[in-house]
């Protein structure tokens, strides 16, 4: 498999913001790790150096993803763009949303994500089989299989993005 490329078998990461199963959502630590990993990977791909504790981009995206996942809602990048603009929450922590992250600044973040989605080079990230640890490790008949994931062609940000999403998929599959 070659994520982000059609040189081999492409693998789609668009479903990678799908809500984890209820059993994982009920485990606060695991869910927090999945949210943090997904958001960190996305922000790395966007070129945003984001500390999970101080970056308002990271905090907003984490809050949005956590809220949607706790409701059992899947998100793709298009849904995430909409959720950044209209998060569906009035507060982040104890701060009013508009004080913490004004609408104009949220729009700028939404545009960065949209630019990624609209970029011709990102199209390869949306093609192929969905990123699913179970499907990578077992055939449809339940037979074990070996899957080779080649990331040598990716830049550092692309590698970080994919490895983070892959790790989240494996953790979700294990639990």
Question: At which residue positions do the language-model features occur?
Answer:
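P-loop NTPase motor domains
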Residues: 1-175
């Amino acid at each position: 498999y070659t994520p982000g490329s059609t040189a081999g078998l492409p693998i789609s990461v668009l479903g990678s913001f799908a809500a984890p199963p209820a059993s994982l959502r009920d485990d606060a630590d695991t869910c927090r790790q999945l949210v943090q990993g997904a958001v960190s990977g996305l922000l790395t791909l966007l070129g945003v150096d984001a500390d999970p504790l101080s970056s308002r981009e990271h905090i907003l995206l984490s809050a949005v993803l956590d809220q949607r996942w706790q409701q059992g809602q899947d998100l793709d990048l298009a849904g995430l763009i909409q959720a950044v603009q209209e998060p569906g929450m009035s507060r982040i922590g104890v701060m009013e949303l508009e004080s913490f992250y004004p609408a104009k600044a949220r729009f700028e973040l939404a545009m960065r994500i949209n630019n990624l989605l609209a970029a011709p080079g990102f199209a390869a990230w949306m093609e192929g089989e969905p990123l699913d640890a179970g499907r990578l490790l077992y055939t449809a008949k339940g037979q074990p299989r070996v899957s080779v994931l080649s990331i040598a062609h990716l830049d550092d940000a692309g590698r970080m993005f994919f490895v983070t999403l892959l790790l989240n998929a494996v953790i979700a599959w294990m639990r």
